[in-house]
Structures are given as structure tokens and as C-alpha cells.
């Protein structure tokens, strides 16, 4: 399995778990906060191990990484929202 495929599979499992927790009554705000905290904990572990911590530079790099990923998600969602509009325009031209 390629890195991209592994990434997508892991992403889907996290979303499935979040959806299960939401179905159990956990609020979206609590879930979003918990997922971000889990990402912060795991990012720290992946760089510094169980007993280490990120340097201020490491925190900045992780923050930038999250910001860049958030921007990619928003761009994809905006493009997906615009596609039906473009399809309607094309059908109107026919």
C-alpha cells in the first residue's frame, strides 16, 4: 500500500471513529477539540518520544503543517461546492 493509500485509510478510520462518537452523543466541538489534542500528542510523540517535548521551532512547524492542511481541506471543499454550479451552467448552455 502506498503512503497516499495508507494516509487515506488512516484518515477514514479517524473519521469513522469520530462519527461513531458523534452518534453516541459526543458534541462536534468536543470531538474537534479531542482530535486536535490527539494530533498534538501524537505529533509530539512522533518527534520527541514518550518523554520529550517539541521546541518552539517544532511547535511552529507543527502549527504551520496543520494550517497548510486546513487550507487544503477548505480549498477542496470550495471546489466541490462549485462543481455543481459549473455543471448547472453547462446544462443551461445546452
What are these regions (language model features)?
Residues 1-94:
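Solvent-exposed interaction surfaces and binding hotspots enriched for charged
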Amino acid at each position: 500500500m502506498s503512503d497516499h493509500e495508507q494516509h487515506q485509510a488512516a484518515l477514514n478510520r479517524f473519521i469513522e471513529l469520530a462519527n461513531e462518537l458523534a452518534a453516541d452523543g459526543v458534541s462536534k466541538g468536543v470531538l474537534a477539540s479531542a482530535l486536535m489534542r490527539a494530533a498534538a500528542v501524537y505529533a509530539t510523540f512522533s518527534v520527541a518520544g514518550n518523554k520529550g517535548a517539541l521546541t518552539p521551532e517544532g511547535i511552529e512547524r507543527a502549527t504551520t503543517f496543520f494550517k497548510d492542511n486546513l487550507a487544503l481541506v477548505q480549498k477542496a471543499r470550495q471546489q466541490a461546492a462549485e462543481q455543481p454550479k459549473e455543471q448547472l451552467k453547462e446544462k443551461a448552455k445546452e
